[in-house]
């Protein structure tokens, strides 16, 4: 967002990039110390002056246009700036009136393409809790970048290829009639897979049959391809139920199989570089000069690896989408894999625009309060079961607190699923997420339900008053109390917060901000009578209530959370 403009900075700026200067500006920890602070020690080394002297020089030279800054203080080596509060209130509320639900958006990404590769479950296997984080973090990054004007391409790079399909085809040939895969595809296919896998361990010839099936599939055999397509379509249909619950949509489902015929080109290009060498039964690119283990491109039996498929995907995406960034949202366990792939991608002859903008966005594990997440039998927890459990727990809470609530099921869905999403996004993604129902569904904690509760409160205040005042009727002076100003300043920062979340690929920056805004409104609501005051005060406070609700709803939407209208 625009910082106050100044002129007449003399020599101090001459060798300083204005972007650097802008990045140095901080928000003081204590509100009494001003609205912005500039740490002069950041210039001390280059200017060969003490921070205190730089602060004095700057204070004398700075001239602000339009009286945007009313006071500048020096504290230690800091310059502290105090904004013109009435001007700030007027600027923020006029912008809200003009932009409405687009408030905080930007066209900074106009004309730029961003590929975001996330979720990516395996066909014919359970869509489990391990896929929650990539799905939720990826979706939020997608929405945030879209809000900033980027053209986003969300890719669900499905695990739909590999030797396991040879086994599934063999199992289905033998016992397909015994299983109802149309009705319950993933559970039934899992049973077939376990059964054929056990048989392979006992009988080498069955394993050979499975390998032959996959070879046939690779060669385009009609029967094997038809079965593979059936398994894939049924799995996607089942995955879609979960995506519908989370309201997530993809622009492409090109997964592993899509690149099966595109890997030969990668291997050819790498062969021409002379860097593809044989080693211990594999074909590798040596990365010892980068202090990394070698990147395995193929096995001697001719089969390819994940790395080869990822390299083929990079080439395809560069050509198809002309991307400005290609982002991968996966677990931190894949950090080395992507470092290797991104290094080898530099050998593919692609423009640096593509190879310099490959970005891995890693995240930590999910743990319950007492360790890793799994059921009593050691099976993984299905994501659909987890989301249904969240909804049913919220229904129980609603029954206890507000049994006559209309649309109970729909509201419980928004709160329960919102709670799961918010819990996932509330901390920096690299930290392991602790999964604890009581914390997550606490309506007074730093949670999704708390933000929804405060949003619903803004709606009920406006419903009670029966109107949203017109901006021209607002007397901005009526919002200069401490609690109102705190909200105005937070709303002013919304666009900047969204940009930071995008730059760092960290939705938690936005999640934390929404908690601060909700808490500020709660405090304002508890200390101020909104309806029934003097008409000018009422109109000003109602408009601020409307603005708060607007930003809470938009911010939650960027995290992938829907707001209920009642609770």
Feature names for model-found ranges:
Residues 1, 11-89, 100-101, 105-567:
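Non-catalytic interaction-recognition regions
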Residues 4:
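Cationic, low-complexity basic patches in intrinsically disordered or flexible, solvent-exposed regions
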Residues 90-95:
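Short, charged, solvent-exposed linker or helix-capping segments at domain edges/interfaces
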């Amino acid at each position: 967002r625009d910082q106050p403009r100044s002129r007449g900075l003399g020599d101090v700026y001459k060798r300083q990039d204005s972007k650097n200067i802008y990045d140095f500006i901080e928000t003081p920890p204590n509100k009494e110390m001003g609205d912005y602070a500039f740490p002069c020690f950041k210039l001390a080394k280059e200017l060969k002056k003490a921070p205190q002297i730089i602060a004095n020089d700057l204070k004398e030279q700075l001239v602000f246009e339009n009286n945007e800054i009313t006071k500048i203080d020096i504290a230690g080596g800091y310059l502290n700036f105090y904004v013109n509060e009435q001007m700030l209130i007027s600027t923020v509320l006029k912008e809200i009136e003009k932009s409405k639900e687009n408030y905080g958006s930007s066209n900074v990404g106009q004309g730029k393409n961003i590929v975001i590769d996330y979720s990516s479950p395996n066909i014919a296997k359970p869509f489990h809790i391990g896929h929650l984080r990539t799905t939720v973090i990826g979706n939020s990054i997608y929405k945030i970048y879209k809000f900033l004007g980027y053209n986003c391409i969300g890719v669900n790079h499905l695990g739909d290829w590999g030797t396991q399909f040879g086994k599934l085809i063999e199992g289905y040939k033998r016992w397909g009639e015994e299983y109802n895969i149309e009705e319950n595809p993933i559970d039934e296919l899992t049973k077939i897979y376990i059964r054929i896998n056990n048989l392979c361990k006992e009988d080498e010839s069955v394993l050979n049959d499975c390998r032959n099936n996959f070879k046939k599939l690779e060669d385009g055999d009609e029967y094997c391809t038809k079965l593979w397509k059936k398994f894939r379509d049924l799995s996607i249909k089942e995955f879609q139920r979960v995506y519908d619950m989370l309201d997530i949509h993809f622009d492409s489902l090109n997964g592993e199989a899509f690149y099966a015929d595109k890997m030969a080109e990668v291997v050819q290009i790498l062969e021409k570089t002379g860097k593809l060498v044989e080693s211990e039964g594999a074909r590798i690119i040596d990365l010892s000069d980068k202090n990394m283990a070698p990147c395995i491109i193929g096995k001697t039996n001719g089969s390819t690896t994940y790395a080869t498929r990822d390299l083929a995907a990079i080439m395809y995406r560069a050509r198809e989408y002309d991307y400005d960034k290609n982002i991968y949202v996966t677990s931190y366990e894949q950090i080395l894999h992507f470092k290797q792939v991104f290094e080898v991608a530099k050998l593919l002859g692609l423009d640096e625009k593509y190879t310099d903008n490959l970005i891995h966005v890693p995240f930590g594990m999910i743990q319950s309060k007492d360790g890793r997440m799994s059921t009593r039998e050691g099976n993984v927890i299905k994501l659909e079961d987890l989301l249904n459990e969240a909804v049913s727990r919220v229904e129980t809470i609603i029954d206890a607190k507000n049994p006559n609530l209309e649309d109970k099921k729909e509201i419980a869905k928004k709160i329960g699923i919102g709670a799961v999403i918010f819990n996932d996004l509330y901390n920096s993604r690299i930290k392991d997420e602790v999964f604890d129902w009581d914390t997550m569904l606490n309506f007074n904690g730093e949670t999704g339900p708390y933000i929804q509760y405060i949003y619903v409160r803004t709606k009920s205040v406006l419903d009670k008053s029966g109107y949203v005042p017109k901006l021209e009727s607002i007397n901005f002076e009526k919002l200069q109390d401490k609690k109102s100003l705190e909200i105005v300043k937070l709303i002013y920062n919304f666009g900047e917060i969204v940009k930071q979340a995008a730059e760092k690929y960290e939705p938690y920056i936005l999640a934390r901000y929404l908690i601060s805004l909700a808490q500020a409104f709660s405090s304002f609501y508890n200390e101020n009578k909104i309806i029934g005051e003097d008409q000018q005060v009422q109109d000003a406070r109602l408009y601020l209530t409307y603005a708060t609700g607007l930003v809470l709803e938009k911010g939650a939407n960027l995290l992938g959370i829907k707001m209920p209208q009642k609770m």
